[in-house]
Design a protein with these regions (language model features):
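N-terminal Rossmann-like dinucleotide/flavin-binding domain of flavoprotein oxidoreductases
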Residues: 1-26, 30-51
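An active-site-proximal "capping" alpha-helix that borders the catalytic cofactor pocket
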Residues: 124-128, 336-349
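Predominantly flavin-linked oxidoreductase catalytic cores and closely associated redox partners
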Residues: 35-36, 40-246
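Active-site metal-binding loops of divalent metal-dependent hydrolases
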Residues: 119, 317, 323
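Short, histidine-centered active-site or binding-site loop motifs used for metal coordination
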Residues: 24, 321-324
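Thr-Gly-centered strand-to-loop micro-motif
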Residues: 110, 320-321
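Residue-level recognition of phosphate/Mg2+-coordinating polar/acidic sites
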Residues: 2, 8-25, 93-96, 112-116, ...
C-alpha cells in the first residue's frame, strides 16, 4: 500500500476533481454517493479521449512484437433494454439484453494489459496462464444454529443486538469483535459477522456476549441486585429478564439455561449463558450478495510493487484489485486496495 496510502488516495481523487470528506477515519466523496466517483472517472476518460469497449470478453491473447495481440468478443450493436423507474430493475434488463445481444469478434493490439476483473478472474487468468487460488465469497452472513436449539433462530429472526462475537476452534479463541448482530432464520448477519465470515470453518463455534460492556463480575452484581428487586430467577419465567433483553431473546436464553443447567436457578449460570451464548457454524450464507471474493491470481506469481506477472518477462502484464488473492475486513480496506493497486499497476506502464 505504501507509507502514506491515505494521502496518496486523497491526492489522486483531488486530481480527478473529487472532493472528499472524512468520517470516523474513513474517506468518502463529499457527495456521499458512489456514483460521484464513477462519473468523475468516466468524465476524465472522456476528456482524455479514452475508448471504452463495454460488455466484451477476451477470447485469446498472444505475445506480439510490441505487447499483446488480443481477440475480443463484443456486442455487435448497442443494447436495447426496457426502461424502469428503479435502477435495480433497469440493471436486470440490461444484463438480459447483454446475454441476448448478437456478438462479433475483433482484433486488438495492446502495448500492455492490466487485469482488473474483480472477484472472478478465472477465465482471464486461464487466458494468460496465471495461477489461481480457489475462490469463495466472503464478507457475507454466516449460516449457524444455536447449540441445542435448532428452532431458536426462527424465534430470533429480525432481532438486532449489540454483542461481542468470539470465534473459537477446538476450544481455542481465534478472533473477536464488537458490533451489531442481526439474527436471521439461517444464522447471523451484520458488519462484525461479515468480518467473521473471512475466518470461519464449518464446525467452529461462535460465542455471543450480549453484555460486552460489563465484566462477568459486574454482570453478576447486576443480576444479584435484580434478585433482591424482583425475587429469584427461574428459567421457566422469561419475563424475569424484561428490561434486560428483548422478549424473544429472553425465551431463547431461558431455554439454553434449562438445557445447560437443568434444575438450577443460580444467576451465576445465567452469567455464563449471557456471556457465552453458543452458535455452531455451518458456513457462509447469502453468498450472491457477498461484498468480496477470497482467492484469485496467486500473489506469489506477482512482483511488487509493480504488480507485474512474474511468469511473463517479455510483455507487460499486470494484475490489481480483487483479481489478486488479497482481501480484508469491512471498513473501506478492500476499496483502498483496489484504488492503490490500480495506481501501482498504471504507474508501472
Amino acid at each position: 500500500m505504501g507509507p502514506q496510502p491515505e494521502q496518496e488516495l486523497m491526492g489522486f481523487f483531488s486530481s480527478l476533481g473529487i472532493m472528499t470528506t472524512s468520517e470516523e477515519g474513513r474517506l468518502y466523496p463529499r457527495s456521499l454517493r458512489a456514483e460521484s466517483v464513477r462519473d468523475a472517472l468516466l468524465n476524465v476518460c472522456d476528456r482524455l479521449g479514452i475508448t471504452l469497449i463495454c460488455g466484451a470478453n477476451v477470447a485469446s491473447a498472444h505475445k506480439a512484437s510490441e505487447g499483446w495481440a488480443l481477440q475480443i468478443n463484443r456486442p455487435a450493436r448497442a443494447l436495447k433494454a426496457k426502461k424502469h423507474d428503479d435502477r435495480k430493475s433497469e440493471l436486470r434488463s440490461l444484463r438480459k439484453a447483454l446475454a441476448d445481444v448478437p456478438r462479433k469478434n475483433e482484433a486488438l493490439e495492446a502495448r500492455a494489459v492490466i487485469i482488473a476483473t474483480g472477484g472472478n478472474p478465472t477465465g482471464i487468468a486461464d487466458t494468460f496462464s496465471l495461477p489461481l487460488t480457489s475462490l469463495r465469497p466472503i464478507l457475507c452472513p454466516v449460516s449457524a444454529t444455536v447449540v441445542g436449539d435448532r428452532a431458536a433462530l426462527k424465534t430470533l429472526d429480525g432481532l438486532r443486538v449489540r454483542a461481542r462475537l468470539t470465534l473459537t476452534r477446538n476450544h481455542s479463541e481465534l478472533w473477536h469483535e464488537d458490533g451489531e448482530v442481526l439474527f436471521r432464520t439461517f444464522g447471523i448477519s451484520g458488519v462484525a459477522v461479515f468480518n467473521l465470515s473471512r475466518r470461519i470453518q464449518r464446525g467452529d463455534t461462535i460465542l455471543l456476549d450480549v453484555f460486552p460492556d460489563l465484566s462477568k463480575d459486574e454482570l453478576l452484581d447486576m443480576l444479584n441486585r435484580r434478585v433482591e428487586l424482583l425475587g429469584g430467577f427461574s428459567p421457566r419465567d422469561p419475563r424475569w429478564l424484561d428490561g434486560m433483553l428483548a422478549p424473544q431473546l429472553s425465551r431463547v436464553v431461558c431455554t439454553a439455561f434449562e438445557q445447560c443447567h437443568p434444575g438450577s436457578n443460580d444467576v451465576v449460570h445465567l452469567v455464563s449463558i449471557l456471556k457465552h451464548f453458543k452458535l455452531l457454524v455451518e458456513g457462509t450464507a447469502e453468498e450472491r450478495s457477498a461484498q468480496v471474493t477470497r482467492g484469485g491470481v496467486s500473489v506469489e506469481s506477482i512482483s511488487t510493487p509493480s504488480l507485474h506477472a512474474c511468469s511473463v518477462v517479455d510483455a507487460p502484464l499486470y494484475v490489481c484489485g480483487e483479481a489478486l488473492d488479497i482481501d480484508a475486513d469491512c471498513g473501506g480496506f478492500n476499496l483502498a486496495w483496489a484504488w492503490i493497486s490500480g495506481i501501482r499497476a498504471a504507474s508501472s506502464l
